[in-house]
Amino acid sequence: MLDINFIRQNPEKVSRMLEQRQQREDIAKLNQLLDFDVRRRTMVQRTDELKALRNKVSKDIAVIKRSGQGSADDLIVQMKAVADEISGMDDTLKSLEAQIEELLLSLPNKLHEDVPEGRCADDNHIYREKLSFDHKLDFPLDNHLDLGKRLGILDFERGAKITGAGFPVYTAKGARLERALINFMLDQHTSVNGYTEVLPPLFVNRESLRGTGQWPKFADQVYYMNEDNLYAIPTAEVPLTNMHRDEILDASDIPLAYAAYTPCFRREAGSYGKDTRGFLRVHQFNKVELVRYATPTTSYDALQEILSHAEGILQALKIPYRVLLLCSGDISANATKCYDIEVWAPGEGKFLEASSCSNFEDYQARRANIRYRPEDGGKPTYVHTLNGSGLATSRLMVALLENYQTPEGSIRIPDVLQPYTGFSSIDQAAE
């Protein structure tokens, strides 16, 4: 969340940020927050004055009682009235602070100066692209749905029977190819890029969702187990970031870099009218996630590193892609700056998002209370957190199948994956 001191000192800047994000309705929340903040500070000052008066009156009563001269009854009555007022103000303050925190949690992050202004995804900027891999696709192309069904490697109908729409089944060489993708990406990120592998829980508590910003703003997107008060993770970003919640790290611990493979679960509420065929929008998918902890002076270098690591996977797989710098109206509420990587799916005839790489600066760290001690021994300060998909396999699988299809209807396996799959092509319905 944003620092209340920053909001107090820069209300116009925060209001402008909300306009840039196309969240003008939140300006009312900002104004309410500023009003509550003034009331809170006034009440704190008044409470401090009353407590000072209570201490003085208490000492005066003690002096009168020790001297045995005069009556302290009037002072005792006065002190009781002061104590009652303090108690009432403390209760009001507690309620006011809870409302302030709720408003702070609901406001989005500030925007980096490089973020282009725009209203929606159409205004995102192409940052760079790499489309010139040698895939000879000069024949009628199938999409991943038709390829998967014909080759017997993907079964969406049985997934729908078992669970419901949006829960795919991988079979035979499709399952092995999915596992190969996951293992290849983990090996790249750990052995080559230097990330520490983590195998985290798949369910988290509400405090963890609040720490990364999924709660309360995106509460309708997560699956909830009512009896256990736990949530299925929408991304490994949640457990990886909350590993250090309520901790003070040493400067020598920074930077931290974690990589994790997990299934991810998303309700995709509000997806009505969007293309939900096959892997284009699913409720369960696999992803290798990258999370970094950095200092304020190094976090934007770390963002470029995460982006290059995600791109490196696509370059090794020789899958055409482009990188978008998201505009102010499309960037997530939690991020200060974000790049999306979109893979080219020739069978679909369009680009598909396969990764988002974001810097949150101290927005998540404030929510999760993650700090570090500077090397000079100064006061602990908040870390900067970053994350990137490295990558999500569902849309990556779409691009792989569609780019590596042959005129004969087979699928060639990328060279870097063949040691993991144990086969070089998929050309028959089942094993």
From Swiss-Prot:
Its EC number is 6.1.1.11. Pathway: Aminoacyl-tRNA biosynthesis; selenocysteinyl-tRNA(Sec) biosynthesis; L-seryl-tRNA(Sec) from L-serine and tRNA(Sec): step 1/1. L-serine binds at T235, A236, E237, E289, S389. Keywords: Aminoacyl-tRNA synthetase, ATP-binding, Cytoplasm, Ligase, Nucleotide-binding, Protein biosynthesis. CDD domains: SerRS_core. GO terms for molecular function: ATP binding; serine-tRNA ligase activity. One of its GO terms (cellular component) is cytoplasm. One of its GO terms (biological process) is selenocysteine biosynthetic process. It is found in: Cytoplasm. ATP binds at R266, R267, E268, V282, E353, A354, S355, S356. Signal peptide: none annotated. It comes from the Bacteria. It catalyses: tRNA(Ser) + L-serine + ATP = L-seryl-tRNA(Ser) + AMP + diphosphate + H(+); tRNA(Sec) + L-serine + ATP = L-seryl-tRNA(Sec) + AMP + diphosphate + H(+). It holds the Pfam family Seryl_tRNA_N. Belongs to the class-II aminoacyl-tRNA synthetase family. Type-1 seryl-tRNA synthetase subfamily. Homodimer. The tRNA molecule binds across the dimer. Consists of two distinct domains, a catalytic core and a N-terminal extension that is involved in tRNA binding. Catalyzes the attachment of serine to tRNA(Ser). Is also able to aminoacylate tRNA(Sec) with serine, to form the misacylated tRNA L-seryl-tRNA(Sec), which will be further converted into selenocysteinyl-tRNA(Sec). This is Serine--tRNA ligase. The gene is serS.
